[in-house]
């Protein structure tokens, strides 16, 4: 195992980030796309396998629009994912947030439409 990495009840390392690549949003939207639901269902399976995991639900936007507007939009995106997880049986006590980071934490350039699309996302970040 890697130093500092949590070990699950089965003796296997616990993922430190639950990869939600594909839980991206259409421009100016906070609704889940069909492909996002598939990915969230996979994340739910991980959360069910590791009941000790706590995760932060973090929403993000691209840089189009005002910073204030994008902050609210990122919060709505995080809330959408948070609600989906709790509706599917994940205890809200295991979820930090929902938290919105607006346009402050891009993972790609905001200079291209492809980069902006990747920045319109929600992440689950393991907290323990």
Residue ranges of predicted features:
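Periplasmic peptidoglycan-binding/tethering modules of Gram-negative envelope proteins
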Residues: 1-55, 87-91, 128
């Amino acid at each position: 195992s890697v130093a500092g990495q949590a070990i699950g009840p089965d003796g296997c390392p616990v993922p430190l980030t639950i990869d939600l690549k594909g839980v991206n949003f259409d421009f100016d939207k906070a609704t889940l796309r069909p492909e996002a639901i598939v990915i969230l269902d996979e994340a739910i399976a991980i959360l069910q396998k590791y009941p000790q995991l706590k995760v932060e639900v973090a929403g993000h936007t691209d840089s189009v629009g005002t910073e204030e507007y994008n902050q609210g939009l990122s919060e709505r995106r995080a809330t959408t994912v948070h609600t989906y997880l709790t509706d599917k049986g994940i205890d809200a006590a295991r979820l930090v947030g929902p938290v919105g980071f607006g346009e402050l934490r891009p993972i790609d350039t905001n200079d291209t439409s492809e980069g902006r699309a990747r920045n319109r996302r929600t992440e689950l970040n393991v907290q323990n």
